[in-house]
From Swiss-Prot:
To B.subtilis XkdO. It comes from Bacillus subtilis (strain 168). InterPro entries: Lysozyme-like_dom_sf, Phage_tape_meas, Transglycosylase_SLT_dom_1. It holds the Pfam family SLT. The modification Phosphoserine is found at residues 970, 972. This is Uncharacterized protein YqbO. Residues 12-59 form a coiled coil. Residues 586-627, 645-692 are annotated as: Disordered. Residues 618-627, 661-672 have a biased composition (Polar residues).
């Protein structure tokens, strides 16, 4: 069975409204804390005429309510009438609609129940529109759902809120029309003064942080930004001015030119201004380029080459000093950069860097660089040039140009690259031709003059927004000038108000204000927010969800109608603000004959307007606005609506970079969009003549306004709150705008009976909807929803008579008997009063801040006192004219919206409909609930599921425990068992004994083998060494003639067949071996020319006993060589055989022959033998020390890692199981806490306790097993050591146990590894023996230290390990693995910088590529790391190195210092280091035999042809030497011969099937090595890979 879950959601519309209310309260607080900004415009008469006409039409038609609400009063009441008709005559219902999205999914569930027993379905029931039919469908389908998981979501969307919101928005619009009654349009005071403040702050900051005075800052910034149209914002221009002043020290005209050019480049390149400033500063300081010249240079390069890699500005900043040293002009720099870029350079930095490198090298010449100059110009011209470098007669740019020109004439690309790299640096290796193009470009200078101005003009001309942007700049300039003037002029007024506020009298007055306002807020709080508490108290009751909707909405509207009118009404007290703006803005009435700046601006404005005609959007007159954009925004008209939307989306409307106040007035200001004002001025409103001149209603001069105020007189009454301010006296007379605040005093002291009169008498004090809405929202006993509607309409009319009419009208009585009846409300809003008090607590805190904010907001009271009375009377007359209009409308409203019978009918219909829809939803829920109860909320259902889970978990734990027991017992029986270890040692001992026995046997056989070998020595020479190189193949054409090489040469070799390259100076031992092989191929034999060898030998023989004594301390099995006298016997036998023949044929001195041909060679052999032994010992030691057993790796992978993996994963298994279960459990509200505690929590707790024991037991047993068996392991190790020592003592008669253990320690390690893991390796022995080829190749094995050095360098340079073989090959060929090697013979050494170290790098290459901190060229790791860096930069990969590439293609390593056999055509370097070599063609021709004889002679040997008669026996010289046999000294070396057999422990195994084969191979390897050493004399190492 599956799970079924139903979820009903009540869409929370109330919370969003509450958040809006909270935001209103916060804005109210900010308004009280911030400055009060008033704007006024006189449009009363026109609006009143429109209202009067519309009211007449309303009364003429028979309708319940003919009052429409629109967001633009200007559109006329025609739209209002249509909207009102829709509102009053339509059916007002709260529509609960259903959108059935569940049916399709239910059909799928019903059709697939047989296959979906464990599936998971989530049908969603979204209740939206027209519920009845859909709810029936849901009920039918739910009955079909069984064993599934469903989540129907019932969403109740109240469409009433949207309708009421629309009404509210239209009321707000109507209020806005009245609030802006006296707004003159144009500039808001907030934006003007904010602009002035921002400008003054910028100029002060720049002046304080630079060397420019404030006056010059303002003048230069305005000239650049406003007049020359440069820069993105005034602030950006001023900061650029500061940067350039600080970085260059320029002033006056030079600074202004730098700033303007820098700003234009920033716009042209769309670059960061600060980055442009840095580039200009560097060019000004180093190249002495003016702002205009720098701008022209950058603009020219940018137009012709772009901004390569975005580094043009950075290049100018970084390399200006290099350009200065080279004495380059701006035109030359531009031309060079463009040429180099078009030639293929990646960026400007590479080009400039090559210039800097050349400039350094031309003044600090090394020998190789001098040679490069001589190659290009000749010695004589080079000398002149160097002289010119020193005395300055040849500049850097001239020398670079000449070098580039000379290089272009070098046809050989390789030679050109070598010279250019030497003179220009490594950038040439990367770029090549672009460097030369750049250098040649220096020869000419680009014409950059005027480039910046042309590009900037084209940018402006092609931008369609340029006129708009220029208009905005003009407006910003005007706004800045006005704001600066206002802030400067109001300084004394602020001083006066500050003095009053800080005086004792002022403090007392403010305390009284605070107390009275707090009392007003408390009284309001008694009836505020009654709807919200009811919603909170009953929100969780799902069954009454529909009943909550309608009351909550009504309460919501009430809440909105309280705070908004309070905010806007109190925040805008004094609709007489028209006088404020008129007074602050100087009179600009045009006068004939004047020529002031203001007059010129007005004249131009009028002229432009006249040319545009009636369609002009720019109003004429002194207060006209620019065309572009909206300067101010009104929260109660189009601008305000859009502004609210923008704020809701989290967006802010800001100026480009300046102060936000440039575009946005503060939140407390009431403003109107310039677009609406323009329509007002042009007269394009609904119901009016678009061509009618409305300027008379807009342009009201200060004198006209003043006269109107005087004529009307003042009738304001002062209330309680601000009454103390009436007696402010001389302090208040000097504070502007204080009179406006005094107007609000008429509002204080009102009560339930006289509220209408009090609010109405304020006139413009609470303009617009604030007046009417306050009637319905603020005063106790008056309802909110209808009061707000009435207040919105009443506020449009104004006047104290309106308030009186409402106080005494039947409207209020009707309202009190319906919506405002205590009993009627108490039935629907239980528990509201207590919550209202808590909701209004913030108001008292808000008003408490008024005291502090008055200090910084009220202005000159004296000015206001003089003007207030006239303005007040004038405003009162305007309100009275609207009062009569209201009387005609009042009757219609009374019979509809304020009729108890009318409302009663509407409410009953809504209530009954909502109840019927909820009943349908309830029945659906009952059906769903039944299904859920039988599955997710059924203990029986859960019990079935849990049992299977529980049993499965138990089985898994049982299996885990049994597995661990098996593992534990297995470990205890093996690793911790003394018996087990003893068995393993036995198998190791058997292998060791077998090997030792074989070695011993070899030792015995070597002596006899040596005898046979000596006897067959000459036979080997005759028969050749075909077993190494195979038999000869078919000979190619005989075109090669061979030759003798005495100096390094590049030559074709092997082009006509096989050839031998035989060294005669570098490695004579190998040369002899190759000579013997070459002779064999040519059908010849080689014998030692004793005379030549002895005469060239130079070093006398030393005592063989002394030499051998130096190497008797061996670390390998030692072979007795005392039987060398047997070799002498073999020689003697051959001497005797032909002795008589020699006597008869030759008359010689027997004593001399004996000394030359027998004694000297034997002594030489004895003298050489210690070296052979020493090399064998050292090689063996290196092989042993570089070979690991792999025990650590085995234990890590086979033992430690499996356990660690289990530990790592166990946490995720446990956490995943618990988290998954918790997620499933918490997603369903089952109410089965007791069941879960019993069947889930406790079993898991028990599992947790048990598993803790299992885990600790597992690890504990493992540790205890290791520790408890420690003694047995120690004993086994001791026994192992004793047995190894004993075996070696007994078998080989060795008396140095420590050395024995050191030498053969790895056999024990191998045995341990094989005991842990026996592996059959079928071809092990063959693979090991195959490594002997390394000995014959002359390369030998790389020592362990070299390998470690190279691996360390590879890791330091983060190079792939695949480079190791190639690097080892290079190290072996270049230095032979010697980190201290220094080459003193090649061309580098002659030039003064020999190649050194492991990889034979020269100092300059090492320094160019060494890693930080690796500065020792003789340190092998440092040297190898630098070589790797050089290979990467030069060849990219190790496989591209010539020597490695040659070997990869089957050829030899490039360079033949050791000689070798050439089997195919190739190009190679021979005679390296001026070492002599012979190249001998492998053919039986005269040339080949001649060259072979010459090579043998150079090596102190002779060549014989066995095919000639008489040559089958010894030569006469050899026979003569035998006559000294009676004096022959038989010698016996007391030393030994050591052979290195290298093993790699990771590949050696032991088992029965391959033991004998392994031993045999080892024996054979020993025999082969010894035979090779005797016959050839090479230095070989038996390397077992």
């Amino acid at each position: 069975m599956a799970k079924l879950t139903a979820t009903f959601e009540l869409h929370d519309k109330i919370s969003r409204k509450l958040r809006m209310i909270q935001g209103n309260a916060e804005r109210l607080k900010r308004a009280a804390n911030g400055p009060l900004i008033f704007e006024a415009e006189d449009r009363t008469e026109r609006v009143m005429r429109q209202i009067d006409r519309s009211a007449n039409r309303l009364t003429a038609r028979a309708r319940l309510l003919e009052m429409g609400l629109d967001d633009r009063v200007s559109n006329g009441l025609h739209s209002i009438r249509q909207q009102a008709e829709d509102l009053t005559e339509g059916s007002h219902e709260v529509t609960v609609s259903v959108n059935d999205q569940a049916t399709p999914r239910f059909r799928l569930i019903r059709g697939g129940l047989t296959d979906l027993n464990s599936s998971h379905a989530e049908p969603t029931v979204s209740v939206r529109d027209h519920a009845s039919n859909q709810l029936d469908e849901i009920r039918r389908h739910v009955t079909d759902v069984d064993s599934e998981h469903a989540e129907p979501t019932v969403s109740i969307k109240d469409r009433a809120s949207a309708a009421l919101d629309a009404i509210e928005a239209k009321i707000d619009s109507l209020k806005g029309a009245t609030i802006t009654l006296a707004v003159a349009g144009g500039f808001s005071a907030g934006s003007i003064m904010g602009s002035g403040k921002s400008t003054m702050s910028q100029d002060a900051y720049v002046s304080a942080t630079s060397n420019v005075n404030k006056k010059d800052v303002a003048k230069m910034t305005d000239q650049i930004y406003f007049n020359n149209k440069a820069g993105s914002s005034r602030e950006e221009v001023s900061l650029s001015l500061r940067n350039l002043s600080q970085q260059t020290g320029a002033s006056k005209k030079a600074l202004a030119e730098l700033t303007e050019s820098s700003s234009k480049i920033a716009q042209l390149m769309n670059a960061d201004q600060a980055e442009v400033d840095r580039a200009f500063s560097s060019m000004y300081n180093n190249l002495k380029l003016s702002g205009k010249q720098s701008g022209d240079l950058i603009a020219y390069v940018y137009r012709n080459a772009g901004d390569q890699a975005d580094d043009l500005l950075d290049t100018m900043n970084e390399y200006s000093s290099t350009f200065k040293d080279l004495k380059l002009t701006g035109g030359q720099i531009a031309n060079a950069m463009i040429k180099g870029t078009k030639g293929g350079a990646r960026n400007f930095d590479n080009l400039a860097d090559s210039m800097r490198e050349f400039n350094i090298r031309r003044t600090e010449m090394s020998d190789s660089q001098v040679d490069a100059f001589k190659t290009l110009f000749g010695a004589k011209e080079t000398k002149k040039m160097f002289k010119g470098f020193k005395d300055g007669s040849i500049s850097g740019e001239e020398s670079l140009f000449r070098v580039a020109k000379a290089l272009s004439k070098v046809k050989d690309k390789t030679k050109r690259a070598a010279i250019a790299t030497e003179l220009i640096g490594t950038q040439y290796e990367d770029l090549k031709q672009p460097i030369l193009d750049m250098a040649e470009g220096i020869g000419t200078s680009a014409k950059t003059s005027g480039e910046l101005e042309r590009s900037f003009t084209k940018l402006r001309d092609n931008n369609p927004m340029t006129p708009v942007n220029d208009a905005m700049r003009d407006f910003e300039s005007i706004s800045k000038d006005m704001g600066t003037s206002l802030l400067t002029g109001l300084g004394p007024a602020f001083d006066k108000i500050s003095s009053f506020i800080n005086s004792k009298e002022g403090q007392e007055k403010l305390k009284e204000i605070k107390k009275d306002i707090a009392d007003l807020g408390e009284e309001i709080g008694d009836k505020l927010n009654v709807a919200i508490e009811w919603s909170v108290n009953h929100w969780d009751d799902l069954k009454t969800a529909i009943k909550v909707v309608i009351p909550s909405l009504i309460g919501l509207i009430g809440y909105l109608k309280i705070l908004r009118p309070l905010l806007k009404g109190i925040g805008t007290v004094g609709s007489d603000a028209a006088g404020v703006i008129r007074k602050l803005i100087p009179k600009r009435t045009p006068k004939a004959g004047t020529n002031t700046q203001s007059e010129r601006r007005n004249r131009n404005s009028n002229r432009n307007a006249s040319t545009r005609g009636r369609e002009s959007k720019t109003a004429t007159g002194p207060t006209s606005l620019p065309r572009s954009g909206s300067l101010t925004y009104c929260c109660c008209s189009d601008g305000g609506k859009n502004d609210r939307i923008r704020r809701r989306r989290g967006k802010r409307v800001l100026g480009r970079r300046g102060n936000p106040n440039r575009m946005n007035p503060s939140d407390s200001s009431i403003a109107v969009s310039s677009e609406r004002l323009e329509r007002r001025r042009s007269g394009r409103t609904v119901g009016t003549n678009p061509t009618r001149d409305s300027r008379s209603a807009i342009i009201t001069t200060r004198s006209e306004l003043y006269s109107a105020g005087r004529a009307a007189g003042g009738t304001s009454k002062f209330g309680k709150v601000l009454s103390p301010l009436k007696s402010v006296g001389k302090f208040a007379k000097g504070v502007p705008l204080l009179g406006t605040a005094l107007a609000a005093t008429d509002l204080i002291g009102m009560n339930k009976d006289n509220v209408g009169e009090k609010i109405g008498s304020a006139g413009g004090g609470l303009a617009g909807a604030a007046t009417g809405a306050a009637i319905g929202s603020v005063i106790p006993g008056v309802g909110t929803a209808i009061g707000g509607l009435v207040g919105g309409i009443a506020g449009t009319m104004g006047g104290s008579s309106l308030g009186k009419a409402f106080d005494g009208s039947e409207v209020k009585k009707k309202l009190n008997s319906t919506l405002f009846d205590q009993k009627w409300w108490s039935e629907k809003w239980s528990g509201i009063k207590s919550n209202a008090k808590t909701s209004i607590n913030g108001l008292s805190d808000t008003w408490s801040n008024v005291k502090e904010k008055v200090k910084s907001t009220l202005f000159n009271s004296e000015w206001w006192s003089e003007k207030w009375s006239g303005v007040k009377s004038w405003a009162q007359n305007k309100w009275n004219s609207a009062s009569s209009v209201w009387e005609s409308v009042k009757g219609k409203i009374k019979s509809t919206l304020f009729s108890e019978k009318w409302w009663s009918g509407k409410w009953e219909g809504v209530k009954s409909w909502a109840q019927s829809k909820w009943d349908s939803a309830s029945s659906v829920w009952q059906s769903v609930k039944g299904k859920l109860k039988s599955t997710l909320f059924s203990e029986k259902w859960w019990s079935g599921k849990w049992e299977s889970v529980k049993s499965w978990s138990k089985n898994k734990w049982d299996n885990a425990k049994s597995i661990w027991k098996s593992v534990k017992s297995s470990i205890s029986e093996t690793l911790f068992s003394k018996k087990w270890w003893s068995e393993k040692w036995q198998s190791v001992k058997e292998l060791g004994s077998s090997i030792l026995g074989g070695v011993k046997e070899v030792g015995g056989k070597v002596a006899s083998s040596a005898k046979k070998t000596a006897g067959k020595a000459w036979g080997y020479v005759k028969s050749g060494v075909n077993y190494l190189f195979g038999s000869g193949k078919e000979k190619p054409k005989k075109h090669a003639t061979g030759g003798y090489i005495t100096k390094p040469t590049i030559s074709w070799i092997g082009e006509a067949g096989k050839e031998f390259v035989i060294p005669v100076e570098n490695n004579k031992g190998r040369g002899k071996m190759l000579l013997s092989q070459a002779a064999s191929k040519l059908g010849m034999s080689v014998v030692d020319d004793i005379a030549s060898a002895s005469s060239a030998g130079g070093e006398p023989a030393t005592s063989p006993l002394v030499r051998s004594a130096a190497v008797t301390a061996s670390v390998s099995p030692i072979i007795d060589t005392s039987s060398l006298d047997e070799q002498a016997t073999s020689f003697g036998q051959q001497f005797t055989k032909s002795f008589d023949q020699g006597i008869r044929d030759n008359v010689v001195s027997m004593e001399a022959w004996k000394q030359k041909n027998v004694g000297q060679p034997m002594n030489n052999l004895i003298s050489y033998s210690p070296n052979y032994g020493k090399q064998v010992v050292n090689g063996y030691a290196k092989g042993q020390n570089s070979t690991s057993t792999g025990t650590d790796g085995f234990l890590q992978t086979k033992v430690k890692m499996p356990f660690q993996n289990t530990v790592n994963k166990s946490s995720s298994w446990g956490s995943g199981t618990i988290k998954g279960f918790a997620s499933g459990q918490n997603s369903s509200q089952t109410g089965t806490d007791q069941y879960v505690s019993t069947h889930i929590n406790k079993p898991f707790i028990r599992s947790k306790e048990s598993s803790n024991g299992w885990g600790s037991g597992m690890i504990g047993n493992f540790v205890s097993g290791m520790t408890s068996k420690a003694s047995e392991v120690n004993e086994a190790a001791k026994e192992l050591a004793k047995k190894v020592e004993k075996a070696f003592r007994e078998e080989l008669d060795i008396h140095s146990p420590s050395r024995v253990m050191m030498s053969l320690g790895r056999f024990a390690s191998i045995g341990i590894v094989k005991g842990l893991d026996s592996v059959d390796v079928k071809k092990f022995a063959e693979k090991q023996a195959g490594s002997l080829a390394a000995a014959y190749s002359g390369m030998g094995a790389v020592s362990g230290n070299v390998k470690q050095w190279l691996m360390a360098a590879i890791m330091a340079t983060k190079t792939p390990m695949s480079w190791l073989p190639g690097l080892m090959t290079i190290a072996q060929h270049e230095s032979g693995g010697n980190p201290k090697a220094i080459n003193l013979w090649d061309s580098n050494a002659k030039a003064g910088h020999p190649s050194q170290g492991l990889m034979q790098t020269i100092p300059s290459t090492f320094n160019a590529h060494k890693l930080p901190g690796m500065n020792n060229i003789l340190n092998p790791i440092h040297n190898a790391a630098a070589a790797i860096g050089y290979i990467k930069s030069r060849y990219g990969s190790i496989n591209n190195v010539p020597g490695i590439r040659s070997m990869r293609h089957g050829g030899p390593y490039v360079g033949y210092a050791n000689g070798g056999l050439i089997t195919k055509e190739q190009i190679a370097r021979v005679g390296e280091g001026n070492k002599r070599e012979w190249i001998i063609p492998e053919e039986r021709g005269i040339r080949g035999r001649y060259l072979l004889a010459q090579a043998a002679k150079a090596l102190g040997m002779e060549v014989t042809d066995p095919s000639e008669k008489g040559q089958t026996e010894l030569s006469s010289g050899q026979v003569t030497a035998a006559t000294t046999g009676r004096n022959q000294t038989t010698f016996k070396a007391a030393g030994g011969k050591e052979v290195i057999i290298q093993f790699n422990g990771d590949q050696h195994f032991h088992n029965d099937q391959d033991m004998n084969s392994l031993v045999a191979k080892i024996k054979q390897a020993l025999v082969d090595e010894l035979e090779q050493d005797i016959n050839i004399g090479t230095k070989g190492v038996v390397a077992f890979d």
